[in-house]
Design a protein with these regions (language model features):
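Short N-terminal signal/transit or membrane-insertion segments
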Residues: 1-27, 45, 108-134, 188-189
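Loop-centered beta-sheet repeat module
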Residues: 145-191
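Bulky hydrophobic/aromatic content
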Residues: 79-165
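N-terminal start-of-chain detector that recognizes signal peptides
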Residues: 33-35, 43-46, 125-129, 163-166, ...
Length: 191
């Protein structure tokens, strides 16, 4: 019995988190239909008790009281306008590849309801920014940040691309050694 109660409460929480927001609340009937569709038995009293248990546990579930109560997730880790700004930044960044941009937008979409996630995906797809193909940039940035934190030197070589898209070392292949102190993001570039 305890296991089925736990599963029901967890599925209720997942449903509220993924499917509801202030513009898309769920009624008790919606919740019961969802739970029954997942093979979890629920009645009105258990939904009321489970939502109250989640609220008592500190989960911000907003209850709109009426003849047919409606429920939705209140505060989330990020508010929708914050997610929109982050999505715009990822989608329009010329340092983040198209593939990585899509992955990051998908991760951001998991932080809100499916309704708002669909809007985020639409906004992200509107970006017409030219994106790089270099997937190594994330690891290079991470390595530099690690070197900064650990107060270690880095070494690198400059290169450029030919019209045939081949990498050619610049400055005779000179190996630069530096002590990095900070990385700064400015004008869509790291410095």
């Amino acid at each position: 019995m305890q296991n089925s109660t736990n599963m029901r409460i967890l599925e209720l929480l997942r449903f509220l988190y993924e499917r509801t927001d202030e513009n898309h609340p769920a009624t008790v009937s919606d919740i019961i239909a969802h739970l029954n569709g997942k093979g979890i038995q629920a009645v009105r009293q258990t939904v009321y008790a489970d939502t109250n248990a989640l609220i008592d546990a500190g989960i911000d579930i907003v209850v709109v009281k009426s003849t047919q109560n409606q429920y939705f997730m209140g505060n989330r880790l990020f508010e929708y306008p914050e997610l929109k700004m982050l999505t715009d930044a990822v989608a329009s960044s010329k340092i983040i590849s198209a593939k990585k941009s899509e992955e990051l937008v998908q991760k951001l979409c998991r932080l809100t309801s499916t309704h708002q996630a669909e809007q985020l995906r639409q906004f992200a797809s509107l970006s017409s920014r030219v994106k790089p193909d270099n997937e190594q940039v994330y690891y290079i940035i991470d390595a530099i940040q690690t070197a900064i934190l650990e107060k270690r030197q880095i070494q690198f070589q400059y290169y450029e691309y030919t019209p045939e898209k081949k990498r050619v070392l610049k400055h005779g292949g000179y190996l630069y050694k530096l002590d990095p102190y900070a990385l700064e993001w400015k004008n869509d570039h790291y410095y």
